[in-house]
Amino acid sequence: MENFPIINLEKLNGSERADTMEMIKDACENWGFFELVNHGIPHEVMDTVEKMTKGHYKKCMEQRFKELVASKGLEAVQAEVTDLDWESTFFLRHLPVSNICEVPDLDDQYREVMRDFAKRLEKLAEELLDLLCENLGLEKGYLKKIFYGTKGPNFGSKVSNYPPCPKPDLIKGLRAHTDAGGIILLFQDDKVTGLQLLKDGQWIDVPPMRLSIVVNLGDQLEVITNGKYKSVMHRVITQTDGTRMSLASFYNPGSDAVIFPAPTLVEKEAEESKAIYPKFVFDDYMKLYAGLKFQAKEPRFEAMIKAMETVKSDPVATA
């Protein structure tokens, strides 16, 4: 089995830059995931984020989760549960407008810590998009520009805890799916495992590594790269011991951003393939995704192509 790709970003600044860029390229083409070390976010910042996130769960969310489990009788299930996930979550929106001040039960220090962490993640996400541009032969800033729309990108964090589960064989922490958006940066627990990705028909553990950032590609990057890079199915399995922390931050296109395969990539591959992905407004894709998240991505792409063809054939729409 191949080793999960681990990228040392510091090596971009020295003689190993070319090799490091090749590792990123291979990870994007063959894994859809990679793990970053020496990514530039200070360790003390991440330590504080982890400590405060785990403290917030214990103080504000753990008892609520236990009550939810009891109300649904989940500890006594005898068959696989397919309609919910064993996770305790809340969401923070950073861009285009932050909602951190509006989220209940966060103390002021935690709000400030998460606001600072989000700014650092935003910067890292944009740096990574430019590295992808470089590997793809696109002009610097191309992906950021496509994501921008008229109001800027959407950027938010899903803060999750996965408590111990008495029936890990029957209940997933998070059911298998691909991510709808752009590029996702994950700060995960380094002691309790759970995240897996699907590669060559096998579920592979994403190794927990202290103070690393796991990166994965969403559906929009698959479309823009005309399939050169792929979004990959992944899931979270539950454990009988330990609570797993997960902070997934999604750097996505703006709601009105128009997403389509990059013309230069379609031209480069014209002899082998044509543009096989639709052109659509990101918000339209998200509306479709909302009801089909835990299904294969291909029917979503096909539905967007059909919607596009319907618009083209509508004489009113084309007048």
Swiss-Prot record:
The residues that hold Fe cation are 177, 179, 234
Q: What is the reaction catalyzed?
A: 1-aminocyclopropane-1-carboxylate + L-ascorbate + O2 = ethene + L-dehydroascorbate + hydrogen cyanide + CO2 + 2 H2O
Cofactor dependence is on: Fe cation
The molecular function GO annotations come to: 1-aminocyclopropane-1-carboxylate oxidase activity; 2-oxoglutarate-dependent dioxygenase activity; L-ascorbic acid binding; metal ion binding
The UniProt record lists the Fe2OG dioxygenase domain at 152-253
TM ranges are: none
PROSITE patterns linked: FE2OG_OXY (PS51471)
Which biological process, per GO, is one annotated for this protein?
A: coumarin biosynthetic process
What InterPro entries does the record point to?
Answer: DIOX_N (IPR026992), IPNS-like_FE2OG_OXY (IPR044861), IPNS-like_sf (IPR027443), Oxoglu/Fe-dep_dioxygenase_dom (IPR005123), Plant_2OG-oxidoreductases (IPR050295)
| Induction notes from the record | Up-regulated during the early stage of hypersensitive response.
What enzyme class is recorded for this protein?
A: oxidoreductase
Q: What is its EC number?
A: 1.14.17.4
Q: Which domain of life is it from?
A: Eukaryota
Name a Pfam family for this protein.
Answer: 2OG-FeII_Oxy
Please give the SUPFAM superfamilies that the UniProt record associates with this protein: Clavaminate synthase-like
Q: Which UniProt keywords apply?
A: Ethylene biosynthesis, Iron, Metal-binding, Oxidoreductase, Plant defense, Vitamin C
What pathway does this protein act in? Alkene biosynthesis; ethylene biosynthesis via S-adenosyl-L-methionine; ethylene from S-adenosyl-L-methionine: step 2/2
Q: Which family does it belong to?
A: Belongs to the iron/ascorbate-dependent oxidoreductase family.
> What is the official name of this protein in its record?
1-aminocyclopropane-1-carboxylate oxidase
Task: Name the species this protein comes from.
Answer: Nicotiana tabacum (Common tobacco)
The UniProt gene name for this protein comes to: ACO
